């Protein structure tokens, strides 16, 4: 029996497992021939792109209802070590015991995490990096009306005006206005523009949305210090606030440190066109752990759901093909598209690495809802449809927006 072990139960991990099983079934093989195992600390696949929304406990899917029906074995445990020489992974189960899991091929799909700062008062920071973090923020916001009145009770400061910072800052306007009439949201960015990594294309739409929503933007400054009721910025400004959300900076999962391979500035593993980790036999990487090149566009893909899904599908197919002595397929993602939520102001959709705006406001918001609430969810209790959507060349659907904007494949 050959063994595929997938570390991580997010988008890349789930679709790696499904694609490996799809090839197994297409070749008429069983679990006794090719075993597929996913090891993940939690029981759920977290829909991480939605964690800026209210009620984040809804943003999860039981892994056993997705992968169980297709015969994927699941181990609930926190991975604490990877030995690529012995081809084993060590995971601590919930009862405190350690499981040693062997593999013939490994897919590291353990994702990424926010880089929290070493600042005075950092324990007062919130984040939406994990389901637990988003739930903590959500609970905190709901309790604000019960707190003692003060100048910063309904003021939120968001640090970092990148993709995540923009989504949570604009969403907080609506979430806070459900609690009080007089609210304030301040967006802090150390660089001189909002959405610095998004470029010029969507910036006019972003700036208009921030202005329309009344979000105060502080550029060229950083967070210096915080307490439970205020923050101090690098220019000396003190802002009374009860809520500070940190979104500035991401890095690949620390599990990449167990893999003796080249890594980029985000800690992602250097992979070849088949998502094999260069220089490390029998190890593949997918999703936010992989610095994968889009050959058609000549760019290393983003740490994003949009790229994690296809990477998982290609990696899962390739590890199975590798064990079956079949040809591997080169990773080829769909053309790059972004869809940025802007809270009550709508959204903006861009295409290409120049990120030219294609849709804005509420037409774009309709697409964002479709993506977040339908397309990125795996089929539950439906093995046939899951496998139909698996495989390296399974495409996302076409979107037909209401209005005059051309349809956009994402």
Predicted feature descriptions by range:
Residues 35, 74-88, 101, 174-273, ...:
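A Rossmann-like FAD-binding core segment of flavoenzymes
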Residues 72-157, 245:
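FAD-binding core/adjacent interface of flavoenzyme oxidoreductases
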Residues 12, 111-114, 250-251, 345:
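Short glycine-rich anion-binding loops that position phosphate/pyrophosphate groups of nucleotides
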Residues 138-182:
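Rossmann-like NAD(P)H-binding beta-loop-alpha module
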Residues 17, 306-333:
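Internal hydrophobic alpha-helix adjacent to the cofactor/substrate pocket in enzyme cavities
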Residues 1-76, 167-198, 245, 408-410:
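Beta1-alpha1 glycine-rich phosphate/pyrophosphate-binding loop at the start
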Residues 344-410:
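C-terminal auxiliary extensions adjacent to catalytic cores
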Residues 123-150, 238-243, 247-310:
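FAD-site-proximal beta/loop scaffold in flavoenzymes
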């Amino acid at each position: 029996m050959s063994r595929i072990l997938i570390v991580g139960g997010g988008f890349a991990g789930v679709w790696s497992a499904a694609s490996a099983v799809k090839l197994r079934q297409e070749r008429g093989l069983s679990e006794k021939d090719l075993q597929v195992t996913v090891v993940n600390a939690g029981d759920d696949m977290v829909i991480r792109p939605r964690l800026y929304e209210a009620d984040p406990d809804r943003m999860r899917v039981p892994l056993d209802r997705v992968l169980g029906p297709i015969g994927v074995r699941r181990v609930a445990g926190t991975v604490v070590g990877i030995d690529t020489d012995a081809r084993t992974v060590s995971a601590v189960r919930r009862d405190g015991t350690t499981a040693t899991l062997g593999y013939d091929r490994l897919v590291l799909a353990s994702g990424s995490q926010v880089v929290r700062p070493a600042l005075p008062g950092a324990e007062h920071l919130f984040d939406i990096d994990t389901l637990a973090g988003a739930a903590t923020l959500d609970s905190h916001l709901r309790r604000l009306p019960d707190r003692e009145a003060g100048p910063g009770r309904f003021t939120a400061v968001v640090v970092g005006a990148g993709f995540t910072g923009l989504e949570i800052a604009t969403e907080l306007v609506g979430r806070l206005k459900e609690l009080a009439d007089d609210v304030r949201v301040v967006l802090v960015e150390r660089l001189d523009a909002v959405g610095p990594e998004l470029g010029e294309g969507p910036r006019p739409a972003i700036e208009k949305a921030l202005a329309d929503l009344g979000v105060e933007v502080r550029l060229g400054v950083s967070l210096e210090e915080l307490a439970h009721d205020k923050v101090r910025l690098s220019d000396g400004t003190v802002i009374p606030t009860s809520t500070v959300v940190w979104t500035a900076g991401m890095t690949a999962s620390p599990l990449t440190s167990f893999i003796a391979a080249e890594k980029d500035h985000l800690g992602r593993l250097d992979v070849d066109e088949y998502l094999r980790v260069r220089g490390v036999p029998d190890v593949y990487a997918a999703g936010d752990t992989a610095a994968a090149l889009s050959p058609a566009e000549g760019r290393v893909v983003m740490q994003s759901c949009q790229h994690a899904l296809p990477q998982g599908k290609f990696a899962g197919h390739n590890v199975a093909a590798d064990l079956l002595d079949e040809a591997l397929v080169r990773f080829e993602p769909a053309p790059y598209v972004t869809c940025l939520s802007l809270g009550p102001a709508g959204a903006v959709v861009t295409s290409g690495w120049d990120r030219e705006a294609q849709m804005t406001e509420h037409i774009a918001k309709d697409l964002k809802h479709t993506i977040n609430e339908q397309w990125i969810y795996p089929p539950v209790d439906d093995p046939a449809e899951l496998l139909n959507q698996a495989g390296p060349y399974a495409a996302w659907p076409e979107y037909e927006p209401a209005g005059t904007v051309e349809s956009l494949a994402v």
